[in-house]
């Protein structure tokens, strides 16, 4: 399901600059930055900032009476680019390795005064004409580093862009005034809402499959059911662990997360549990549909075998008579009788007709 960059051995070490094995100099960090902005008292400051300059601007604002933080968004950075960001914001090297290599389960980790949250993204792509793949749902990952005055987001996959979330927040200065953890909440809320959207579309697919299976006319495609079940299992692995991690945010870390943000996170937790329960029910329903489809196919095969057997029996009678009278013997009953040939043909036809009527009466034909 996921379509991330291949994993390369990590050379990130505390205090050292990262480099991929077999790789030369890293690309400039600006190549991986989708957006970098400073927010002061709920409003975005004009101008473009490099991460270090943005953090310096925030610290200058904080020495006064204002509240500010920086939000840096990265997309699939390499180890060198990620280490440059880690040097600026003081990110823990273990979290940095996770952010570079992706393929992480949803989790929440605390490093001193910083939280590191991993979320799975989902996008329903079954009816996307440009997709070109057989996937029903594509997944990606978003890693969120949250400190007292910064947010660093790292996206992996085609559907990890947070531009819409940033615009939503910038249109609500009151939310941005709550600080970096408000950004974490809004991102989590956006992603969990997408889970519910995906489950709605999957439910439509399951309803269509259910109608197809129990229809007497439609042909049952077991492969498509297996494919959807495989996708649902992937979704279950992506969503189920998240509820526990969100519960930790809403119930722990009160020294870092404002009480108002923790209230909002409880709402996100409720939606996550709802999505997880839906996906679990879909998994069970698809298991039942697989059994029903298998039974339907087996029953259809039995019907086909009965038809084949009936026609074989009908063909066997004239074949047997023809075989007997086709033997090269001189002394056989009826060889000299003038009406022997038409009589044998009539007997063949009568036997075939009787067999046909018998099989029709027993619903074999």
Residue ranges of predicted features:
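Peripheral, non-transmembrane regulatory/ligand-interaction domains of membrane transport proteins
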Residues: 1-258, 264-267, 271-281, 334, ...
């Amino acid at each position: 399901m996921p379509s991330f960059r291949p994993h390369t051995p990590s050379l990130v070490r505390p205090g050292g600059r990262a480099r991929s094995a077999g790789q030369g100099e890293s690309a400039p960090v600006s190549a991986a930055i989708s957006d970098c902005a400073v927010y002061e008292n709920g409003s975005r400051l004009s101008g473009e900032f490099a991460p270090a300059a943005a953090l310096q601007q925030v610290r200058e604002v904080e020495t006064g009476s204002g509240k500010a933080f920086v939000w840096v968004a990265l997309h699939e950075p390499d180890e060198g680019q990620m280490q440059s960001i880690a040097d600026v914001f003081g990110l823990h090297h273990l979290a940095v390795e996770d952010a570079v290599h992706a393929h992480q389960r949803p989790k929440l980790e605390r490093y001193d005064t910083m939280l590191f949250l991993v979320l799975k993204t989902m996008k329903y792509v079954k009816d996307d004409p440009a997709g070109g793949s057989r996937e029903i749902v594509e997944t990606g990952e978003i890693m969120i580093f949250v400190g007292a005055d910064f947010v660093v987001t790292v996206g992996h996959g085609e559907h990890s862009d947070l531009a819409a979330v940033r615009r939503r927040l910038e249109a609500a200065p009151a939310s941005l005034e709550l600080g970096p953890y408000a950004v974490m909440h809004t991102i989590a809320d956006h992603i969990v809402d997408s889970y519910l959207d995906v489950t709605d579309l999957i439910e439509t697919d399951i309803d269509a499959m259910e109608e197809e299976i129990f229809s007497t006319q439609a042909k049952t495609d077991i492969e498509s059911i297996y494919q959807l079940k495989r996708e649902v299992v992937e979704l279950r692995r992506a969503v189920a662990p998240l509820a526990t991690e969100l519960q930790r945010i809403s119930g722990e870390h009160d020294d870092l997360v404002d009480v108002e943000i923790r209230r909002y996170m409880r709402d996100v937790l409720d939606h996550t549990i709802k999505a997880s329960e839906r996906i679990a029910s879909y998994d069970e329903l698809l298991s039942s549909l697989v059994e029903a489809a298998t039974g339907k196919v087996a029953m259809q095969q039995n019907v086909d075998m009965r038809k084949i057997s009936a026609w074989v029996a009908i063909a066997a009678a004239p074949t047997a008579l023809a075989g007997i009278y086709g033997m090269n013997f001189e002394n056989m009953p009826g060889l000299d009788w003038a009406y022997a040939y038409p009589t044998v043909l009539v007997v063949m036809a009568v036997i075939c007709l009787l067999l046909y009527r018998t099989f029709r009466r027993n619903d074999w034909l």
